[in-house]
């Protein structure tokens, strides 16, 4: 798939973009270190970064969009993945185990805010039975203390809360902790108006579009939708005659 996405062009990874500026013919990206910068000219640019780096890149070329992007807060979280033997996991059936997972309201005071029974949710994982995978999302906005625990302690906490919530007391046969520092955008009151203002400001910059989780949701469908919309905007712009692209 990666080959098809870049054909007939090329993809560059691990290339830090330090600045973005509008030119007479499109956009110029400053890449690399300050001591040895590289300049890349582009007809159009899609920013698919989190809000903070997008705000930094747009500060000079789209100040209103940058200001509104800077208002979007982010929270940190961790995913604790636990693997159980099937006979251990389902010794005590609960309504939650017959679904794809459950959510935990903040009022409960638990560190785990959501649980997904991945093996039940995704049919292709069922082939891995008798090992079943359970994913626990840990961390809430404004609560960073729990994420200061080391991996072993955090995994033990998730397993304990799983037992307390739905009675799974089996010992996991494997565990993994994946941390996402500042990776979860928060959609506070006024977010829809904020996003509308960002998109209106960006629309006034020919050949520029934005996409990603900062706008319409963190789920894959929402992110794909923003990507399709951004791609359509850029394609429509590039379809214009060269002489009309600056307008």
Regions found by a protein language model. Name each.
Residues 2-7, 138-141:
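Helix-loop-beta segment of a Rossmann-like dinucleotide-binding subdomain
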Residues 4, 53, 60, 233, ...:
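Active-site catalytic microenvironments for nucleophilic, acid-base chemistry
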Residues 5-18:
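A conserved beta-strand/loop element that lines the FAD pocket in flavoprotein oxidoreductases
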Residues 11-13, 47, 210:
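A structural signal for the hydrophobic beta-strands that form the central parallel beta-sheet
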Residues 16-134, 139-148, 152, 164-165, ...:
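Mid-domain catalytic core of redox enzymes
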Residues 113-247:
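Conserved flavin/dinucleotide-binding core of flavoenzymes
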């Amino acid at each position: 798939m990666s080959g098809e996405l870049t054909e007939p062009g090329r993809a560059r990874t691990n290339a830090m973009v330090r600045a973005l500026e509008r030119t007479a013919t499109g956009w110029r990206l400053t890449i690399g270190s300050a001591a040895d910068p590289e300049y890349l000219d582009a007809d159009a640019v899609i920013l698919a970064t989190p809000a903070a780096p997008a705000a930094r890149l747009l500060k000079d070329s789209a100040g209103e969009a940058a200001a509104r992007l800077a208002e979007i807060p982010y929270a940190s979280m961790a995913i604790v993945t636990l693997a159980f033997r099937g006979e251990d996991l389902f010794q005590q059936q609960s309504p939650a185990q017959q679904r794809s997972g459950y959510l935990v309201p903040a009022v409960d005071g638990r560190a785990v805010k959501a649980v997904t029974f991945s093996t039940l949710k995704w049919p292709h994982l069922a082939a891995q039975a008798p090992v079943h995978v359970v994913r626990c999302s840990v961390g809430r906005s404004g609560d960073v203390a729990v994420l200061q625990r080391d991996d072993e302690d955090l995994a033990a906490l998730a397993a304990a809360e799983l037992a307390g919530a739905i009675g799974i007391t089996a010992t996991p046969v494997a565990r993994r902790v994946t941390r996402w520092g500042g990776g979860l955008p928060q959609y506070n009151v006024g977010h829809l108006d904020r996003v509308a203002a960002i998109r209106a400001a960006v629309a006034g910059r020919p050949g520029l579009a934005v996409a990603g989780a900062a706008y319409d949701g963190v789920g894959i469908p929402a992110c794909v939708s923003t990507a399709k919309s951004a791609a359509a905007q850029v394609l429509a712009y590039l379809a214009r005659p060269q002489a009309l692209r600056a307008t």
